[in-house]
Amino acid sequence: TKVNDKVYVLCGTKTPSLIDRVAIDSLEAVIKMSRSLFKYLLIDVPAGFNPTSIAAAEMSDTTYVVAMMNGGYEVKHVQRALEIFAGWEDCANRVKTVFTRVVPCNDQSRRKLTEAMGCPVEAVMPNAYMVVSKAADNGQMALDLEPDSPLAMSINYLAGRIIHPPAGGIGDD
């Protein structure tokens, strides 16, 4: 489905929980085919690790572990999640962290999270629950609903870092 001139939604299950019904070899075939058609692929998987999310991560050039701030245990949860990827030779360059619903959403908060994590935090996103919910409920992109919002600025910042990584690589400032 074409969302706009630069964004296409290729496929998805009716609900995230149905991802376990997708055969791994079928997912890998779709990823391989998509790589030949598109410069960037975003594969959104449900929270937690399952064979499907692991296969997607293993085929990725970069894996973003995204956590929503919601009570204080997120740093420990992300640290534990990163342990799963520690066996990858290029883990430090290939696995990045992003925190959402960060208040205040600024570089100081990103630095504090980086310090708490013990590794770089690639980006922080503001708490934009209402606009994200409205966009999801209406099949729209949050960026289209509020293109000048702090959320849009944060997403555009991360997209810019993906497209044009800093000289030392993504995650370096």
Where are these regions (language model features)?
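Short, well-ordered turn and helix-capping elements at secondary-structure junctions
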Residues: 13-14, 47, 129
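Residues in well-ordered beta-strands of folded domains
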Residues: 11, 98, 126
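P-loop/Walker-type NTP enzyme "switch/lid" segment
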Residues: 1-36, 133-137, 141-144
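NTP-binding/hydrolysis catalytic cores, primarily Walker-type P-loop NTPases
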Residues: 137-173
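Conserved catalytic-core segment of NTP-binding enzymes
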Residues: 21, 25-36, 40, 45-123
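Beta-strand-loop-alpha "switch" segments that mediate conformational coupling across diverse proteins
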Residues: 101, 114-142, 155
